[in-house]
A protein has these predicted regions:
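Conserved nucleotide-sensing/catalytic segment adjacent to the nucleotide-binding pocket
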Residues: 1-21, 26, 39
């Protein structure tokens, strides 16, 4: 088990190999960590964008298998606060961008898997 810091891309690059199956649990916790890096939300968003782009830049080239777990947070009531709304929006953007690069995407609700891709 490896606990990654905010630089998830670097952590994955350091441990990925053809013989590994890596389970990343969870992307929304990683997003939270990145958005709370600075009290100034605009600065935190810059940091988040850098980390997200770094992950998206390497994910297809990593050897082995990687399973990403995340929470779908955009299907319910979205709080009015700036940080909460940003979190929901950025989680959705991350899910879309990562899904476009993944070979298989499974949305699981109440233990029932729905294959969205692959």
């Amino acid at each position: 088990m490896v606990e990654a810091d905010a630089n998830l891309a670097a952590t994955l690059k350091s441990i990925a190999n053809d013989n590994n199956i890596i389970l990343v649990d969870c992307l929304t916790l990683w997003l939270t960590r990145c958005l709370l890096v600075d009290e100034d939300l605009s600065k935190a968003l810059i940091f988040w964008q850098q980390q997200k782009e770094a992950l998206l830049a390497v994910v297809k080239s990593l050897p082995g298998e990687i399973i990403f777990i995340s929470n779908e947070v955009g299907q319910g009531v979205i709080p009015m606060g700036a940080l909460s709304r940003t979190f929901v929006d950025e989680a959705g953007f991350l899910h879309q961008a990562l899904a476009s690069q993944c070979d298989r995407v499974v949305f699981t609700v109440a233990g029932l898997p729905m294959v969205l891709k692959g």
